[in-house]
């Protein structure tokens, strides 16, 4: 016979029970359907983004926080504990690693990203600009191969921002570091562009050449690095998703008319 403590422990480890607790942010679906049960784990606020970061290779708490900058440290800790309780994640020696169950969500997370790129209005996406997330993603996907075989320092300046205006990417021996303060190295390439333009390039909506032609992208410094920028810059893994040929127009709602009786 289960004691109250046993019951409490089981409830804390069961996603359906946890979702139904009064202090939870969700109430649970109360269905045996596998879609409902999986959604109680996957669809908790911030969880898909945390899983995205883990699937992209982030292993440490601070790296996860940089990839999801708007989540509080307290809530991130809670979500990581929940993922461990649900069997998707293990923590060992200060590192977080996905279990086979967590890795099995890769196709789902990537599919969600491709769906968003294909069907969500690009203009809506470009309203959610975040220099921290953009530069962190660029650091993660930059390809050092086209760059000169030496330390290369690239400075990005987003002139319209009041703070977090300047960022540096330092590429050395295949490693890429992101700095928010001047690393003290000579800058090989200097880029000045609005954050929206840089985000558009990263998302595959625009290109370096198109933004230069439009007068929204200034680059100076090493000419070879500038010439091959589109090659080493990398793109969002979702950039290759193609938009539908013709935008799907939503069906207009017909106003409800109450007909008088008589």
Task: Map each language-model feature to its residues.
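Amphipathic alpha-helical dimerization/coiled-coil segments
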Residues: 110-157, 164, 223
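N-terminal helix-turn-helix DNA-binding core of bacterial DNA-binding proteins
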Residues: 33-71, 86
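A short, conserved structural fragment
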Residues: 84-93
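Basic, amphipathic "hinge/linker" alpha-helix immediately C-terminal to the N-terminal HTH DNA-binding motif
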Residues: 43, 92-112
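N-terminal leader segment of winged-helix/HTH proteins
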Residues: 1-39
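Basic amphipathic alpha-helical segments that dock to polyanions
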Residues: 76-84
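C-terminal interaction segments
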Residues: 184-262
